[in-house]
Amino acid sequence: MGCVSKIGVGYVVVTNGIATNATNVVFGVNPNVWRALPCEGIALLKIRQAVPTAGAGLPVAIAVPVSSTVSTVTDSNTASSCCYTISDVAVVNPVNEAVVGSSMVNGTERLLYFNKVKGIIRLMDCCTVAAG
């Protein structure tokens, strides 16, 4: 009989800050929550910050901690507010295209797949409409 992997379900991750620069929009999450998640799973991402107009067309990333003593981005709209012992993991859609800031709406929830080992954060509730 084969081994079946179980992907955990029922996790909630809430954004706690946002930083923008010329190349991307970075959402922060609570480092304790991120570390408590399993290596792979599905979670509900609650977006609680508005993306500035300048970040609407920029790729989105989520800042995840790389050690136990770091925090993530703050509510400031400047990259200088970031704690630099984090790693920005790009957010992609189901077909591995970068998600842009205008897709991340304050006060909404998004379903996401994450794999901490491979560095994957993929929104599962959006898709690319085929050109017709």
Q: For each of these PLM feature ranges, what is it?
A:
Residues 1-18, 129-132:
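Short, intrinsically disordered N-terminal pre-domain segments
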Residues 37, 47-132:
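Acidic, glycine/polar-enriched metal-coordinating patches/loops
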Residues 3, 23-25, 71:
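Aromatic-residue detector
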Residues 11-40, 50-56:
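Surface-exposed ligand/attachment interfaces on beta-rich extracellular proteins
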